[in-house]
Amino acid sequence: MVGVLLSVTAGSAYLGSAVVARHRAQAAADLAALAAAARVAAGPETACAQANAVARAMRVSTIGCAVDDLDVVVTIEVRLAVGGWGSARAAARAGPTKHA
């Protein structure tokens, strides 16, 4: 019985950690993409450097940064806090809206 309770508790902690990591990854990707979009006029290198700086400040890893015209797409990865197994990834796009 104790083993079952410990297994359920460990599983719940891991699931909770995964949800938190996913939300952290999306928030960091959104903020990094907005920061990069604000610097896109200075060039793609400057924009991606700004995205990396924001990611470092939020203690997450930048997987990718792509600039296409005025659009910036940033991909972020966050390691799970519990167990250290796996990670959560999220991507965000920032730039002007496209009008038809």
For each feature predicted by the language model, list its residue ranges:
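A general, composition-driven signal for non-globular sequence regions
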Residues: 16-20, 73, 87
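Alpha-helical scaffold segments in soluble metabolic enzymes
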Residues: 31, 50, 91
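Alpha-helical assembly-interface signal, strongest on the long, hydrophobic N-terminal helix that forms
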Residues: 1-47
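Low-complexity, S/T/G/P-rich flexible repeat/linker segments used as non-globular hinges
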Residues: 82-100
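Short amphipathic secondary-structure patches
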Residues: 34-80, 96
